[in-house]
Structures are given as structure tokens and as C-alpha cells.
A protein has these predicted regions:
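A short alpha-helix-loop-beta-strand transition element characteristic
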Residues: 62-66, 70, 78-91, 151-160, ...
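Beta1/beta-strand and adjacent pyrophosphate-binding region of the FAD-binding site
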Residues: 2-14
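N-terminal FAD cofactor-binding segment of flavoenzymes
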Residues: 20-81, 375-385
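A glycine-rich dinucleotide-binding beta-alpha-beta segment and adjacent secondary-structure elements
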Residues: 278-343, 350-352, 370-388, 392-399, ...
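Feature captures the FAD/FMN-dependent oxidoreductase FAD-binding
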Residues: 72-146
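C-terminal auxiliary extensions adjacent to catalytic cores
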Residues: 395-445
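Internal hydrophobic alpha-helix adjacent to the cofactor/substrate pocket in enzyme cavities
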Residues: 350-370
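Predominantly flavin-linked oxidoreductase catalytic cores and closely associated redox partners
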Residues: 112-268, 272, 276-287, 291-292
């Protein structure tokens, strides 16, 4: 190899996956994580791969973009996806994890590789040599400034908001009922808090008028739709959230035998099901207001909070115009990975960490970089994030809106069309992987 040492900055999802993949390819890796010496507004621990928002890695359905991404990552050998499966908790058709167990599994994978050196402490200057910056959306101000000097231009900022987590033993199970949407009562992975029209309207009034924690520096920022605070959604219209996080479709309140006017779903945070998060209720309300407002929800009147919702600033670069097709800063030994690239989502962060490792390895052995088929979930996302023609770049999840249309001209239902996208993607990926044994097979010389 032309070089065999790499510094990875950031011990989140992208950085952890990247470090493990590099180590498995013979590199000496220095994995730098600023916590616990320096924390962030959203982190609660000093563990690697801490999940700071939801504990869900989204759908596993093969006809969904999120499910397709997981299938692609499995074929590409993602270690963190395997950790997620081993830490999974019941969540219907989604892959949700016990966040503590997940971090423990990732740390065990890192510790099992003696060529990874974990260094705790803030990185304030980008080191010499080959570097992968996976500092995440909560990149420290000092390092953010260094990144901006490196790529030129200004960072873009948006907000993420995390949902509250409650103690299940303090919930009123005579009111809450267990059911996943469209499934039999009592057999679902979610708890549901039903509201009638009067309860819903009172709750929305309280939610939209409650005191918020909004710092002056945060004002005027963009709220990313996928993690928008519930109170902001509710402000767009009195029924907006009833057609979103509080939609009652597919649910039946066993007390009435009818569909409730609205409902809040709660999803298990751990395998023991002692803690539940309020699905879709990321919030920036003050802690006191969160307690007051959520205690208005039937079944949650006496709920005790393991964690209140928080809101934090995210930073990402204008990737299409400052990075190349491998997420490298042209003319440097630096690559970016994870949400700092503007690819949004847990599995997307894992994926870009994997790609950073693969492309760094390809560079070291003098091989071509990874060029995933654009018909795939990850290939389409990379294309969007690195195409200079992309205008008004904003954070993006994998979604089928990024993939090229089917070419056979057949009319299909939405589900059949998505399944056809997935089938096409996996066929193309399998064919591509077969052409790259240097990166994905046993031949890594």
C-alpha cells in the first residue's frame, strides 16, 4: 500500500464503521473522539456510536428505500448493521435497537482490533496525512472552523430535535393499548395513547403555545423536515400533526371499539421494554413545559421522564460543490463521512463511513474508487450528494425519489414499483461487487 496510517475524527456511526473497515484492511487507525473531555448539547454519554435522536434505524421492508439500504450494506459487509441486528428490540417492520447495547457492541468491535487506537480529546486542527473527518452534525466549533477553511465557503446549519423517553412503569396501561398499525389488538410492538377530539384540541393548543428553548443563534435556521420539532409541525395547521405523528389510522381503541380521533405512539427503547419514546415527538419545549404538556395525554398523566426532548444544531458542508465523488476534498488527503456531508440518517452515516474506508483503501492500493450503481439506494444518494448540478443542497435521506425511473414502461402500484426498484438495485449491486474483489472480496493485496 502507498500508505497504511489513517486518522479518523469522530467516534459516531460513520467514524466507527470507517475505523473498523480500515483496520480490517490492514491500516493502523487513530480514532479520535472528543467525548468525554468535550461534550455536545445532545450527547449523554462518552460511548462510541451513541444514538442521540431516535433509536430506530427505520424500515426493514424490502420495498422501502430504508430497507433497500440495509440490504445493500449487508452485501457490502457493514459491521455496524450487524451490531444493530444483535441489539434489536421489537419495532414492527422497523429495525430499532437498545441504544446502550448497540454502543457496547460497537465498542467491542473496535476493541477487538488492536490496530485501532482510540484517542479521547478534542481535535482542533486537521492533522497531516490521510484523514477521514466523521465528526458528525455536532462537530465542535473549533473543528467546524477548520473544515470550513479546508473546503472554503460557509457551513449550512439546521436543527435536529430528540423525543422524550418515559418510564413505562409510570404509564396508565388501562388507557394505553398495544397495537401496531393495521395489526390485531394486543399483538403490536407499540403502545398507543388515544385522544378524542376535545383532548386533541386542548393538547395542540398547549403544545403550540408552550415555552420553547430557542437560543438567539438558532433563530432563522432551517428545520429539517424529517426531525422537525412536533410543535413546529402543529403550528402549520390544527390537523397537521393528526395526519402525521398522531395519525390514528390502523388503530382501534379497545375501550370504544373505534378508531380514536388521534393517537400518540410509544416505541420501546430497550429489550426489557422499561423505557419508551414518544414517536415523532421531537421537541424543543422547556423541560417544565414538556412535563406539563405531555401529562395532558391520556395514559401519560403521571409519566416520569427518563430523558426530556432536546434540540441541537447540526452542521454540514455543501458537498456537491466542495467534495469529489468519493467525498474527498480535492487536492488533499482528507475525506468526509457521515452527516457532516449532508447525507442524513443513521444508516446513511454508517454507509458513508463504509464508503470512506473503501475509497481510502482504494487510493492506498492505487485502485479505482467505489462507483456504486446509481439505481441503488446508496448509489443514488451519493450521486445526489456529489453531483455539482445539485442546486440548493439540503440534508437528504435515501429515498426512491433519487433513483432513475424504471425503463420497461409497465404500470405498477406504488408498492410493486418500489419492489421493482429494490430488485433492480440489488441485481446491479451484486453485479458491481463481483467486479471489485479488490475491495469487497478476499483479494486485498
Amino acid at each position: 500500500m502507498q500508505f497504511d496510517q489513517v486518522t479518523v475524527i469522530g467516534g459516531g456511526l460513520a467514524g466507527s464503521e470507517c475505523a473498523i473497515q480500515l483496520a480490517d484492511r490492514g491500516f493502523a487507525v487513530k480514532l479520535c473522539e472528543m467525548r468525554p473531555q468535550v461534550s455536545s448539547p445532545a450527547h449523554h454519554t462518552d460511548h462510541l456510536a451513541e444514538l442521540v435522536c431516535s433509536n430506530s434505524f427505520k424500515s426493514t421492508r424490502p420495498d422501502s428505500a430504508a430497507g433497500l439500504l440495509k440490504a445493500e450494506l449487508e452485501r457490502m459487509g457493514s459491521v455496524l448493521l450487524d451490531c444493530a441486528h444483535r441489539a434489536a428490540v421489537p419495532a414492527g417492520g422497523a429495525l430499532a435497537v437498545d441504544r446502550v447495547k448497540f454502543s457496547e457492541l460497537v465498542e467491542a468491535e473496535v476493541a477487538a482490533r488492536p490496530n485501532i487506537e482510540v484517542v479521547h480529546g478534542e481535535v482542533t486542527q486537521i492533522p497531516e496525512g490521510h484523514v477521514v473527518i466523521a465528526a458528525g452534525p455536532l462537530c465542535s466549533p473549533a473543528l467546524s472552523e477548520e473544515v470550513m477553511k479546508l473546503v472554503g465557503g460557509d457551513a449550512l446549519a439546521f436543527f435536529d430535535a430528540a423525543a422524550p423517553i418515559v418510564d413505562v412503569s409510570t404509564l396508565d396501561m388501562d388507557v394505553l393499548f398495544s397495537q401496531s398499525r393495521y395489526e390485531e389488538q394486543g399483538s403490536g410492538d407499540y403502545l398507543n395513547a388515544p385522544l378524542n377530539k376535545e383532548e386533541y384540541e386542548a393538547f395542540i393548543e398547549a403544545l403550540t403555545t408552550a415555552d420553547r428553548v430557542v437560543l438567539k443563534d438558532f433563530e432563522g435556521g432551517d428545520l429539517f423536515q424529517a426531525c422537525q420539532p412536533a410543535e413546529e409541525v402543529a403550528r402549520t395547521g390544527k390537523d397537521a400533526i393528526r395526519f402525521g405523528a398522531m395519525k390514528p389510522v390502523g388503530l382501534t381503541d379497545p375501550r370504544t371499539g373505534r378508531r380514536p380521533w388521534a393517537a400518540i405512539q410509544l416505541r420501546a427503547e430497550n429489550k426489557e421494554k422499561t423505557a419508551y419514546n414518544l414517536v415523532g415527538f421531537q421537541t424543543n419545549l422547556t423541560f417544565g413545559e414538556q412535563k406539563r404538556v405531555f401529562h395532558m395525554v391520556p395514559g401519560l398523566e403521571n409519566a416520569e421522564f427518563f430523558r426530556y426532548g432536546v434540540m441541537h444544531r447540526n452542521t454540514f458542508v455543501d458537498a456537491p460543490h466542495v467534495l469529489d465523488g468519493t467525498f474527498a476534498v480535492p487536492g488533499t488527503g482528507v475525506r468526509l463521512a457521515g452527516q457532516i456531508t449532508g447525507t442524513e440518517g443513521y444508516m446513511e452515516a454508517v454507509a458513508t463511513g463504509l464508503l470512506a474506508a473503501l475509497n481510502t483503501y482504494a487510493e492506498a492500493i492505487g485502485a479505482a474508487g467505489v462507483e456504486l450503481p446509481r439505481v441503488g439506494a446508496l448509489g443514488a444518494l451519493v450521486g445526489y450528494a456529489t453531483d455539482p448540478a445539485t442546486v440548493g443542497y439540503q440534508p437528504m435521506h435515501v429515498n426512491f425519489g433519487l433513483v432513475p425511473p424504471l425503463e420497461d414502461g409497465k404500470r405498477r402500484s406504488k408498492r410493486d414499483r418500489y419492489q421493482a426498484y429494490a430488485d433492480r438495485a440489488l441485481e446491479a449491486l451484486d453485479a458491481y461487487l463481483a467486479t471489485r474483489p479488490d475491495l469487497f472480496g478476499g483479494d486485498r493485496s
